[in-house]
Amino acid sequence: MSGKANTSKKKSQRVKRNVKQRADKEDEELDSPENKVGNRAKRNRSHAGHLSSKEQTKCVHLKRVKISSNKRTAWQPLPKNTEEYLQSMMDSAILGILNKNIKRKEQIQYHLDQLKKRFLQQCATLKVPPGKLNYLRDMSKLLKVEREQERANEESLASLQEEIDKIVETTESMTENIESLKTKIEILTNEVEKEEEEMKEVFHIDSNKVLALPELSQKSLKAPILQKEILTLIPNQNALLKDLDVLQNSAPGKNMAAFIQEAYMKLNGS
């Protein structure tokens, strides 16, 4: 009877130890960040059940991953170059935010600095799997490449600034030339106006641009015609007129007149 009692006690103690180990293991898994993520995923899934179809598409579904404690023992702290890279990225992001035209910059800067400080403190104590850090081993090289790219960008910006300065100088010189040409045009316009006024005074041109010529005298209107003056010099005027009429109506005279007319026509046509 005593042997059976001892064996039953041993079995009960063994069962208690197994139950306790299982409970401790479950507590560790529940306290681990992966299980926290899983619990969040469960809460997200339960919350997504109450959302509409459009809102459910926007929800991020987190996948629960179980990692044994043996694997977590091989994890290593985050490398320093990775921390430096993350710090530089956060600094550039903060500068990009503060460069914008926003209100309460000092409060925002203080808040962002505190977030950066807390984040870097978490990174200092963070342990990650060594296999996952293969892509982070070349952070120094990446930083070097980025710095070289930054230098190249600065040089290109400097060259662009020089070109812009040259263009500004040429535009300024062109503006000066245009202004000088405008002054010359104004001077020439004034000179032309003065010359026009002088011409009006010389030629007596009125506002209607009509040339004010002097009036003819009455003597010039009553003066005899040149033909009459010539005829007065000839004693036998009637006989001369008859002879001229005979010559004009004769065949040789008509031929001569036709010849002269044809010659004029050819000259006008040429």
Swiss-Prot record:
**Where does this one sit in the cell?**
Nucleus; Chromosome, Centromere
* Keywords tagged on the record: Centromere, Chromosome, Coiled coil, Nucleus, Phosphoprotein
Major localization listed first in the record, in broad terms: nucleus
Q: List the disulfide bonds.
A: none
Record PTM text: Phosphorylation at Ser-52 is essential for CENPE recruitment to kinetochores and orderly chromosome congression.
Which InterPro entries did the record assign? CAD_CENP-Q
Assembly, per entry: Component of the CENPA-CAD complex, composed of CENPI, CENPK, CENPL, CENPO, CENPP, CENPQ, CENPR and CENPS. The CENPA-CAD complex interacts with the CENPA-NAC complex, at least composed of CENPA, CENPC, CENPH, CENPM, CENPN, CENPT and CENPU.
According to its UniProt record, which protein family does this protein belong to? Belongs to the CENP-Q/OKP1 family.
* Function according to Swiss-Prot or TrEMBL: Component of the CENPA-CAD (nucleosome distal) complex, a complex recruited to centromeres which is involved in assembly of kinetochore proteins, mitotic progression and chromosome segregation. May be involved in incorporation of newly synthesized CENPA into centromeres via its interaction with the CENPA-NAC complex. Plays an important role in chromosome congression and in the recruitment of CENP-O complex (which comprises CENPO, CENPP, CENPQ and CENPU), CENPE and PLK1 to the kinetochores.
* Name of the protein in question: Centromere protein Q
The organism's taxonomy opens as: Eukaryota, Metazoa, Chordata, Craniata, Vertebrata
